[in-house]
Amino acid sequence: MLTIESFAVKIKDYLKFDKEMRDIDVTWLKLGRHLRLVDGAKMIIGRDESDNNALLAHPNDKFEQVKFKESDDIVGAVSFISKNASKADKELAARLTLAYTKASKDDEFEVSIANEKFIIKPEDKKLAQEFFVK
């Protein structure tokens, strides 16, 4: 359950990077794990099926979905990253998204964000900890 304190931290982080807060932005602040990546991009990773479904059901035009190659048949969290993210943040987001799946940690996978494709291995989930908004 989202606590008032954790929600306040997410709002404070949001306003530091974006002064325009819309209803959809507030909805998204209530969903998923929120990360602030190295170059400042915001990443959101669904915590569970309910989060995944809610994120997909309420599109936010400030974000791009991190997608897997369909033929890889990867099951895991739904993830999004800021549309204005740097290439480095996009690659990190792709690696972190793979970390929250059952994908083999030794194999490479094709991950796409908008029109960019990355062939990468999953990152260790522990790395995500340092980017959580807290």
Where are the regions that the model predicts?
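Generic C-terminus detector
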Residues: 84-134
